[in-house]
Amino acid sequence: MRKGSRFEQLFLPHLDAAYSLARWIVGRDQDAQDIVQEAYARALKGFSGFRGDNPRAWLLTIVRNTAYSWIKKTPKRRKAADSF
């Protein structure tokens, strides 16, 4: 099985949860979409390190970390996230 096929099989079912988490953290649709896109790219890049235990938890951890990194990029985003 191709790496991409396996990745899609494991992680695409969690796309809605990934978006919901990113949206909850940053509060804006466009930012959440960008975060999920970046998180999926990071997940694909690090896929060889995935041990297969819990794909949803692994992916959502990447989404959360990507969102927090995103917030740190600009004070305006940080201020919006702090209000939650």
Feature roles, as predicted:
Residues 8-9, 48, 81:
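Pre-signature/interface helix of ABC/ABC-like ATPase nucleotide-binding domains
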Residues 34-41, 45, 53-65:
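Structural recognition of an alpha-helix C-terminal capping motif at a helix-to-coil junction
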Residues 13, 47-50, 62, 74:
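Residue-level signal for short amphipathic helical patches enriched in basic/charged
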Residues 61-82:
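Arg/Lys-rich amphipathic alpha helix in sigma70-family domain 2
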Residues 1-20, 30-36, 44:
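A short, charge-rich alpha-helical start-of-domain segment used by transcription regulators
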Residues 3, 51-53:
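Residue-level signature of the cytosolic catalytic core of signaling kinases
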Residues 18, 43, 47, 67-71:
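Hydrophobic recognition helices of helix-based DNA-binding modules
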